[in-house]
């Protein structure tokens, strides 16, 4: 399994913005700041803007932030018990393939729990 | 097996300092913290393997109250594995949980309980050398990371609504919201529906199977919104209409619930993209499917800013674009990176 163009990744507790695990590079070399930002974005999407409640029983799957230099993908890790984790992958804009990365992140998030 | 949170002989100190000391000496045992809520942090050769507190649901409560495990399954694992301290391993070996689930659950429960056990500036603390936990070692966390995270979590709560009484007092929703329209998250709704004026935040966390810290965090947000009676302003009278004074003290309309700024801006990657995690990605051997190819084509070439999809789903790609794909194999991250996330999970604790 490959995510071409991935520069760095982490698993973040989005209630607290705590990076549970990190690997590779982080924006500004600061995984903790990236994790805090990740948590803010997830909170904004779930609790403040109401995108996730547009349809009954809708569920937030992922969030994609596009900058001129990169893609920032956030994928919610679904567990049966209360865990509140999000997988974050930073993709290089030129080398990355957004659609492929998105599908592979889904697989990774599922495998994190399923194995 | 010193699982209880009963303190016999102890001195008053900062729990985090004692944890650091136990870690420095690579000790094995339990740091038992008294007071309210108190708790215990279990260390194995200087690394934290578990923590528990009456204010935080443990692994068993999280797994059973969510319905992930039947109460009987959990009880069986306890009966079988408690004496040998391998309850966690048993659940995986018997196929009730995956290793990933167990690790994520233990990790979450440990940081959660550690917050309650260690957040007091001073409390009666005692180190019980040799004490082991029946769960067994599932994760190994650096105590420094725990201490830092505890301090950060204290700060986060105060940024939301700086009143620690909310964390412990019986939860009592205001009978009438302080404004015409309010928006709640699912957890906030659950908390308000189950708050009966008697249950404390810890009771609610256990009842709902939610992390104790997440519960307290949402309650502080509710308090900031003016939706909770603060202990001080509670009265025994049954008046249903609150005086404006109450609103004023409880509602801080200008306070953003979540830090709106100060967070890191999404950075701009400069021309030379970081290649710290450069690992050979055999992308050429992995042809993107047609649905992905347009994206790839665009990215393989020089970056052209606002390029919107001009192709209908399923339509054939223009020949010149399709020819470009796949892009030159990028020494990007891959399977190794993903595996490293798992490895990092283990390495970080």
Locations of regions flagged by a protein language model:
Chain A
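C-terminal binding/interaction regions
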Residues: 61, 67-115
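A generic "binding-loop/recognition-motif" signal
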Residues: 15-16, 70
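Short N-terminal helix-loop-first-beta-strand/juxtamembrane motif that initiates sensory/input modules
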Residues: 2-15
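A charged amphipathic helix-loop-strand protein-protein interaction module that recurs
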Residues: 26-75
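A generic fold-level signal
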Residues: 4, 57-58, 83
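Generic secondary-structure signature for well-ordered alpha-helical cores
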Residues: 5, 47-50, 110, 114
């Amino acid at each position: 399994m490959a995510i071409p163009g991935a520069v760095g990744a982490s698993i973040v507790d989005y209630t607290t913005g705590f990076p549970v695990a990190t690997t590779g590079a982080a924006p500004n070399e600061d995984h903790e700041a990236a994790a805090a930002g990740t948590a803010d974005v997830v909170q904004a999407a779930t609790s403040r803007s109401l995108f996730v409640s547009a349809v009954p029983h809708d569920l937030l799957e992922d969030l994609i932030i596009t900058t001129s230099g990169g893609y920032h993908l956030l994928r919610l890790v679904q567990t049966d018990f209360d865990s509140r984790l999000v997988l974050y992958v930073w993709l290089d804009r030129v080398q990355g393939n957004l659609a492929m990365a998105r599908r592979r992140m889904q697989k990774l998030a599922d495998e994190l729990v399923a194995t | 097996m010193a699982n209880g949170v009963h303190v016999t002989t102890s001195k008053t100190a900062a729990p985090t300092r004692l944890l650091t000391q136990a870690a420095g000496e690579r000790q094995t045992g339990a740091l038992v913290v008294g007071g309210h809520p108190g708790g215990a942090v279990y260390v194995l050769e200087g690394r934290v393997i578990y923590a528990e507190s009456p204010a935080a649901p443990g692994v068993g409560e999280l797994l059973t109250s969510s319905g992930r495990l039947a109460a009987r399954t959990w009880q069986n694992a306890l009966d079988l594995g408690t004496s040998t301290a391998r309850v966690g391993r048993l659940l995986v070996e018997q196929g009730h949980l995956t290793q990933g689930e167990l690790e994520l659950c233990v990790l979450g429960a440990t940081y959660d309980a550690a917050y309650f056990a260690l957040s007091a500036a001073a409390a009666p603390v005692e180190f019980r050398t040799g004490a082991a936990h029946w769960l067994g070692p599932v994760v190994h966390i650096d105590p420094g990371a725990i201490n830092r995270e505890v301090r950060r979590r204290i700060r986060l709560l105060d940024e939301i609504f700086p009143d620690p009484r909310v964390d412990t007092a019986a939860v009592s929703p205001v009978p009438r919201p302080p404004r015409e329209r309010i928006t709640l998250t699912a957890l906030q709704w659950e908390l308000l529906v189950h708050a009966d004026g008697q249950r404390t935040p810890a009771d609610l966390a256990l009842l709902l199977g939610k992390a104790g810290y997440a519960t307290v965090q949402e309650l502080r947000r509710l308090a900031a919104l003016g939706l909770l009676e603060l202990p001080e302003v509670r009265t025994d009278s049954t008046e249903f209409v609150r005086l404006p004074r109450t609103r004023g003290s409880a509602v801080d309309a200008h306070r953003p619930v979540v830090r709106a700024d100060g967070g890191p801006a999404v950075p701009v990657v400069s021309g030379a993209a970081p290649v710290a995690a450069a690992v050979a990605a055999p992308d050429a051997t992995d042809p993107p499917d047609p649905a992905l190819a347009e994206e790839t084509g665009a990215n393989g070439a020089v970056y052209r800013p606002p390029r919107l999809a001009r192709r209908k789903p399923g339509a054939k790609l223009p020949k010149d674009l399709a020819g470009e794909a796949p892009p030159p194999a990028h020494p990007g991250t891959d399977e190794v990176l993903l595996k490293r996330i798992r490895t990092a999970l283990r390495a970080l604790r």
